[in-house]
Amino acid sequence: MSVSRRVIHHGLYFAVLGPLIGVLFLVLYIFFAKEPLVLLVIIQVLPLFLLLSITTGAIPALLTGVMVACLPEKIGSQKNYRCLAGGIGGVVITEIYCAVIVHIKGMASSELFENILSGDSLVVRIIPALLAGVVMSRIITRLPGLDISCPETDSLS
């Protein structure tokens, strides 16, 4: 498979599924670590919660997917190293992205958005990014679309 196809495949899957894995973790974290009644409030605003998580997490997840797709063959072919690189890359890219967003300040228009991106809520940013990076790096080779051969690009390589 060509590198460009792998970059598109990994990037899109990471961007679509990565934030959803983060939301799943946050819902479980709120249910077990906080009051379970808070979960009822989140379920009531779940579409807004999903939209907010996708808008804040899709770009870092896309960049993490591109990074995992561009890993050298020795690292990318071994599951444990790929998961380690995906998890660390997810955290680093998410923190850089959040720092840029907070620095711009024009994009952080709502108070909720500013609270999520502030330094006070590391659990909301780092752990979902770490888990999404590890899980997506682990399952990315099993997702459909990776083994499709294309006669136009196969003849070029």
Curated annotation (Swiss-Prot):
Cytoplasmic membrane side: 1-11, 58-83, 137-157
Location within or outside the cell: Cell inner membrane
Record topological domains on the Periplasmic side: 33-36, 105-115
Protein name: Inner membrane protein CbrB
Keywords: Cell inner membrane, Cell membrane, Membrane, Transmembrane, Transmembrane helix
Lineage: Bacteria, Pseudomonadati, Pseudomonadota, Gammaproteobacteria, Enterobacterales
Keyword Lipoprotein: no
Residue spans crossing the bilayer: 12-32, 37-57, 84-104, 116-136
Keyword Cell membrane attributed: yes
GO cellular component: plasma membrane
Membrane topology listed for this record: Multi-pass membrane protein
Family: Belongs to the CbrB family.
Superkingdom of the source species: Bacteria
Organism, as annotated: Shigella sonnei (strain Ss046)
